[in-house]
Amino acid sequence: MISGEQTPTQYIQHHLQNWTVGEGFWAVNVDTIFWSVLLGVLFLWSFRRVAKKSSAGVPGKWQCFVEMIVEFVDNSVKESFHGKDKLIAPLALTIFVWIFLMNLMDLIPVDWLPTAAMYGGYWLGFVEDPHDVYMKVVPTTDLNTTFALSLSVFALIIIYSIKYKGVKGFAKEMTFTPFNHWALIPVNFVLESITLLAKPASLALRLFGNMYAGELIFILIAMIGFWQLPAHFAWAVFHILVITLQAFIFMMLTIVYLSMASSEH
């Protein structure tokens, strides 16, 4: 999209608008689903390809890179998850790589893919006005994505709590912590419920806030004309740290929360 065709406000709003089908509760952000699924498939395909071709001989560069990531995640799980569960390491690896890939889309110049989608839709006859086509390519700048991820973690927290503590143990934790007295059961339940619900909320909002702010800065940089290339590069170098850190934080907090849920005390 060429910023000169629109006012600055229209340009920013267009880039922050999802390709949405439907209305209200049944609205679906098609671009979010498309890019998140595509990146998930890319992750599975690339890692499976390495696993199938891995050998005891001299590994290639990509195999070394994948093995380094797997070892890093595996060590993180061993240090943070105080228990034995075969699901945690694959789950942590999936969370880290998938979120990293979704975040990484933020480094693509903001006009490239939306412009291709805009004029592609126009030339194919899907729309009469190219500006009626919207395309957000960073799934983690959509609250639907971050809350879907965090609510999945929340469901696992409940499942692991019941699995390791039993229904009775989980209920006791919710009603007799932190004050071990029957008269304070309502207070305990409210406090524990808030603590429990704060976990997925903080996971979702932290990831969304950091990525949304980063995307907005890239959009503002794209509006400054000739100097946008060096400015984009400078911000991208810094943003790589944010991208990686947010994926790592989400992974580590997931491991810690599940470790706490599986702890008997």
UniProtKB/Swiss-Prot annotation:
Pfam families reported for this sequence: ATP-synt_A
Segments passing through the bilayer? 25-45, 88-108, 142-162, 207-227, 233-253
Bilayer topology reads: Multi-pass membrane protein
Transmembrane helix is among the record's keywords: yes
Leader sequence residues: none
Any single biological process term in GO? proton motive force-driven plasma membrane ATP synthesis
Q: Which CDD domains match?
A: ATP-synt_Fo_a_6
Task: Mention any one GO cellular component term assigned to this protein in its UniProt record.
Answer: plasma membrane
Provide the protein's localization.
Answer: Cell inner membrane
Could you tell me one molecular function GO term of this UniProt entry? proton-transporting ATP synthase activity, rotational mechanism
Q: Which UniProt keywords apply?
A: ATP synthesis, Cell inner membrane, Cell membrane, CF(0), Hydrogen ion transport, Ion transport, Membrane, Transmembrane, Transmembrane helix, Transport
Q: What is the first-listed, main subcellular location in coarse terms? A: membrane
Q: Does the keyword Transmembrane helix apply?
A: yes
Concerning InterPro entries, the annotation shows: ATP_syn_F0_a_bact/chloroplast, ATP_synth_F0_asu, ATP_synth_F0_asu_AS, F0_ATP_A_sf
Quaternary structure and interacting proteins, as annotated = F-type ATPases have 2 components, CF(1) - the catalytic core - and CF(0) - the membrane proton channel. CF(1) has five subunits: alpha(3), beta(3), gamma(1), delta(1), epsilon(1). CF(0) has three main subunits: a(1), b(2) and c(9-12). The alpha and beta chains form an alternating ring which encloses part of the gamma chain. CF(1) is attached to CF(0) by a central stalk formed by the gamma and epsilon chains, while a peripheral stalk is formed by the delta and b chains.
What is this protein's function per UniProt?
Key component of the proton channel; it plays a direct role in the translocation of protons across the membrane.
Q: Which family does it belong to?
A: Belongs to the ATPase A chain family.
Name of the protein in its database record: ATP synthase subunit a
Q: Which organism is it from?
A: Idiomarina loihiensis (strain ATCC BAA-735 / DSM 15497 / L2-TR)
Gene behind this protein:
atpB
